[in-house]
A protein has these predicted regions:
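C-terminal-of-GTPase-core extension/linker across diverse P-loop GTPases
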Residues: 1-3, 7-16, 20-27, 31, ...
Length: 252
């Protein structure tokens, strides 16, 4: 099902709306975003990425939505300055929260590449629901850690260790890394592993969720209670026992 929402205007324009119609339109658009699997963000090629576009991309990422960015009015762009690849790279750089999004350049006026938008949406939806075998994930993990091992914690000899990874869910694809201690994996190494998943497996247009689960800390074993002292038998009488009968007789 496709839902075409009204454009979400700047906050100042929404606040200035006398009848509240703008706010109602924004509320409906936000509900549509939360219901959707794939969000399509339309950008004016001449205007470029705006602050409002940036905020919306941040919302899509936080909601875990697959994203397709459509750069419209491509017919108005100077081809000597912009190529499709250069525009896509520029858009992904500015919309850093959805740097993984699919980018399609179109001209709605002339109907150019409009069908590519639907194809990108379908593919993003497929990737959003995709499951990957555990064996494939761990093969990628093994190669990634061989190429770049987890760092050693500064000031100690402790080193991060990854036992295995498995997929925990979809929409968006979510993965759990089982490690010795999640605190030993800084953000840059976590981003490195996400890039390795994308480079080797794909997921174009879909966000990924990576979770880290450390080994549970063992509770220190309680010492067993000392055995209760028991009263000793007759051997403890004073004098060390009785003397033998004739031991004390004198010689005549």
């Amino acid at each position: 099902m496709l839902i075409d929402t009204a454009g979400i205007r700047k906050r100042s324009r929404v606040a200035d709306s006398p009848d509240g119609a703008e706010q109602l339109s924004v509320d409906r658009a936000m509900r549509a975003v939360r219901r959707a699997d794939v969000a399509v963000l339309v950008i004016d090629a001449l205007e470029g990425v705006t602050q409002q576009d940036f905020r919306l991309s941040e919302l899509f990422a936080s909601e875990g939505k697959a994203v397709v960015v459509v750069v419209n009015k491509w017919d108005r762009v100077d081809p000597r300055i912009w190529s499709v690849e250069k525009m896509a790279e520029n858009v992904r750089t500015q919309l850093r929260h959805v740097s993984w999004a699919s980018v399609v350049c179109t001209s709605a006026l002339y109907g150019r590449h409009v069908e590519d938008v639907l194809q990108a949406v379908i593919e993003a939806g497929v990737q959003h629901r995709r499951r990957v075998p555990t064996a494939t994930l761990n093969m990628v993990l093994r190669e990634a850690t061989q190429w770049k091992a987890p760092p050693t914690q500064r000031g100690s000899l402790r080193k991060g260790r990854i036992y295995y990874v498995t997929q925990a869910g979809t929409r968006p694809p979510s993965f759990v890394f089982f490690v010795n201690d999640e605190k030993l994996f800084p953000d840059d190494y976590r981003r490195y592993l996400e890039r390795q998943l994308r480079d080797n497996i794909g997921f174009p247009g879909s966000p990924l969720r990576l979770f880290w689960r450390g080994k549970p800390k063992r509770e220190p074993r309680a010492k067993p209670p000392a055995p209760a002292a028991t009263a000793s038998s007759g051997g403890g009488a004073a004098g060390g026992g009785r003397r033998s009968g004739g031991g004390g007789s004198s010689r005549r």
